[in-house]
């Protein structure tokens, strides 16, 4: 009996061991770590290569492989929207333009980061950048600043020196206008016969249009939107201060200081003309400065004309409310559906001070870290930019901003369309355009509050901004502005020859008809 009992125990023991062995969890084996994917946009020259250099150090440190996917800005919105809404093929960490953060946050598609704020340390970042990490009036943080896109006046040092123009000469709007006239009046031509012009900017075919208007509007106390008495956002396009700032910016074209040829170009084309040494001033991102230090084979501008001429960054000329430049940039975020703890580790790695310093120096954008910016202040070409962060402004962080920005693009495009033919310029038409799109902004904000500015009130502010006085017959005329010469008209993009020919033909036709009738 004892033998039988012992035999049964042995068999049972073997069976149980076999069962447990069969069900042993495979996790005991070394787990294979998935790679982490980062989505970015084209930041500076060779964006993928530059980020991969930083991520190589991360892989060396952690053993986790990474993959960088570069999305063109034109496709980025749709790709990101699809990935975040569906959760299919979404990245682990992604770059978002600062104005995109509120939209995806409001949809619950990017992960709240408040739990990790001690590791992030908000006090490290400049306020204007940290304010873009969340929705306006909300305390939930959804992203971490990566770099700052600040847009100052960029000046060609050689052209300024040739015309004896100093930085303090263009500190005010009137001073800037005088400098523009001085360069235009010099009638300089380059070796290839190209005329040097003072200032140019893109218009109706460019998504940067609101960014171009914003500094001149903000510097005169205006804004695209504002809160009403109930604390709700509403359109502010037809407020006197906004109108004043818009008129000041349009005056560059109305006073033939800027060629209407530029109105057919986009930002890339304008920058190309600046890089070719054909423009004294543009308003653009600071990356151009860094590119002049990078060899051409690496995507830089070191051996180009602008590399030889050199670039100087200057504040936006002061308006009635000071000098306020546009500030944008990009933040890093994690999709809500991402369950990898390593994704947060990678985000923290990319936004630590060491990496912010190294990466921004490669792409030429400003870092958002106060400590890193202190070092940048020692750079002769960048030190003028750092103080601008204290007075510059970013767009209001609301979910509707993306749609509002598209409305603003359409509005300013319509205005530029109207200004293409100077003879058809009409204040009534400008007012009509602003009123139409102001109503569209209010509709998007679900605010039915009327702007209340009558045409007479609009006209009064418009004339004040453009230095227009009324004659006894109530016919406006512009003062303090000399009549443009034929050369200035040609420089502005207006060619009088076809008009003279057309008028001559018309007069000849009328004269022939009269003679025929007399017979």
Where are these regions (language model features)?
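Conserved C-terminal helix/tail region of periplasmic/extracytoplasmic solute-binding proteins
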Residues: 391-519
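Glycine-centered hinge/linker elements that transmit conformational signals in sensory
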Residues: 178-184, 216, 228-263, 312, ...
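Extracytoplasmic "Venus flytrap"
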Residues: 35-52, 149, 207
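Hinge/lid segment of periplasmic solute-binding proteins
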Residues: 30, 97-152, 174, 192-197, ...
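Extracytoplasmic "Venus flytrap"/periplasmic binding protein-like
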Residues: 57-128, 158-164, 171, 272-273, ...
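Long, aromatic- and glycine/proline-rich binding clefts that accommodate carbohydrate-like moieties
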Residues: 134, 308-316, 360-417, 467-472
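Short, solvent-exposed loop/beta-turn-alpha elements that line the ligand-binding surface or hinge
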Residues: 114-127, 198-203, 220-244, 296-306, ...
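Extracytoplasmic/periplasmic substrate-recognition and gating elements
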Residues: 56, 61, 85, 134-140, ...
């Amino acid at each position: 009996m004892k033998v039988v009992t012992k035999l049964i125990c042995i068999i049972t023991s073997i069976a149980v061991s076999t069962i447990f062995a069969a069900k042993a969890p495979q996790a005991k084996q070394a787990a294979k770590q998935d790679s982490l994917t980062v989505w970015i946009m084209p930041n500076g020259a060779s964006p993928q290569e530059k980020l991969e250099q930083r991520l190589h150090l991360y892989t060396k440190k952690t053993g986790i492989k990474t993959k960088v996917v570069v999305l063109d800005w034109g496709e980025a919105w749709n790709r990101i929207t699809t990935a975040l809404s569906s959760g299919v093929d979404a990245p682990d960490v992604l770059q978002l333009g600062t104005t995109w953060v509120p939209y995806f946050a409001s949809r619950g598609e990017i992960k709240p980061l408040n739990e990790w704020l001690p590791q992030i340390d908000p006090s490290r970042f400049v306020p204007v950048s940290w304010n873009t990490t969340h929705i306006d009036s909300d305390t939930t943080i959804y992203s971490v600043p990566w770099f700052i896109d600040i847009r100052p006046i960029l000046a060609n040092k050689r052209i300024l020196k040739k015309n004896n123009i100093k930085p303090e000469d263009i500190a005010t709007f009137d001073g800037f206008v005088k400098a523009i006239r001085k360069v235009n009046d010099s009638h300089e031509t380059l070796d290839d016969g190209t005329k040097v012009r003072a200032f140019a900017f893109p218009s109706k075919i460019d998504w940067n249009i609101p960014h171009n208007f914003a500094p001149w509007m903000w510097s005169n106390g205006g804004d695209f939107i504002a809160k009403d008495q109930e604390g709700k956002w509403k359109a502010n396009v037809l407020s006197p201060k906004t109108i004043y700032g818009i008129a000041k910016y349009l005056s560059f074209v109305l006073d033939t200081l800027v060629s209407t040829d530029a109105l057919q170009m986009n930002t890339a084309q304008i920058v190309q003309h600046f890089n070719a040494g054909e423009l004294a001033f543009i308003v653009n991102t600071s990356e151009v400065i860094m590119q002049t230090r990078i060899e051409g084979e690496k995507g830089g501008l070191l051996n180009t004309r602008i590399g030889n001429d050199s670039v100087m960054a200057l504040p936006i000329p002061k308006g009635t409310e000071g000098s306020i430049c546009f500030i944008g940039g990009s933040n890093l975020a994690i999709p809500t559906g991402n369950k990898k703890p390593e994704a947060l580790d990678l985000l923290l790695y990319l936004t630590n001070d060491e990496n912010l310093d190294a990466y921004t120096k490669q792409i030429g954008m400003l870092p958002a870290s106060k400590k890193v910016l202190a070092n940048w202040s020692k750079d002769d070409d960048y030190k003028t930019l750092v103080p601008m962060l204290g007075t510059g402004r970013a767009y209001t962080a609301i979910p509707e901003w993306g749609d509002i920005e598209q409305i603003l693009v359409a509005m300013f495009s319509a205005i530029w369309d109207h200004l293409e033919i100077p003879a058809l310029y009409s204040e009534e038409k400008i007012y009509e355009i602003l009123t139409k799109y102001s109503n569209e902004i209010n509709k998007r904000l679900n605010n039915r509050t009327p702007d209340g500015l009558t045409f007479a009130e609009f006209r009064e502010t418009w004339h004040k901004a453009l230095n227009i006085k009324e004659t006894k017959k109530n016919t406006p005329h512009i003062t303090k502005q000399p009549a443009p010469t034929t050369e200035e008209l040609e420089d502005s993009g207006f060619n009088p020859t076809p008009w003279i020919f057309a008028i001559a033909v018309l007069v000849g036709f009328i004269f022939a008809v009269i003679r025929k009738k007399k017979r």
